[in-house]
Amino acid sequence: MDGIKYAVFTDKSIQLLGKKQYTSNVESRSTRTEIKHWVELWNSYEMNSHRLPGKGRRMGPIMGHTMHYRRMIITLQSSYSIPPLRKKRT
């Protein structure tokens, strides 16, 4: 489970918490099958993931990009819960 970066707390993800759906970012090079194996440890019954587009950053004349992440949404069974994931430092 080292590939899980941090939990995501946006307006949409907070609404999904009421439906027992947890949102977190993982490393972009992780595959769906690897993520599926991590999720099986939490006794979930559904997992969805997608890649987030990187944003452009400019430092003078040079154009760069921010890090790319993959976001996963885990839906748990009603009787299970997961421990809190570590938060992103700001």
Swiss-Prot record:
The keyword Amino-acid biosynthesis does not apply. The keyword rRNA-binding applies. It is found in: Plastid, Chloroplast. GO terms for biological process: translation. GO terms for molecular function: mRNA binding; rRNA binding; structural constituent of ribosome. Residues 1-46 are annotated as: Coded by first part of gene. Residues 47-90 are annotated as: Coded by second part of gene. One of its GO terms (cellular component) is chloroplast. It holds the Pfam family Ribosomal_L23. InterPro entries: Nucleotide-bd_a/b_plait_sf, Ribosomal_uL23-like, Ribosomal_uL23/eL15/eS24_sf, Ribosomal_uL23_CS. PROSITE patterns: RIBOSOMAL_L23 (PS00050). SUPFAM superfamilies: Ribosomal proteins S24e, L23 and L15e. Keywords: Chloroplast, Plastid, Ribonucleoprotein, Ribosomal protein, RNA-binding, rRNA-binding. Binds to 23S rRNA. Belongs to the universal ribosomal protein uL23 family. Part of the 50S ribosomal subunit. This is Putative large ribosomal subunit protein uL23c. It comes from Spinacia oleracea (Spinach).
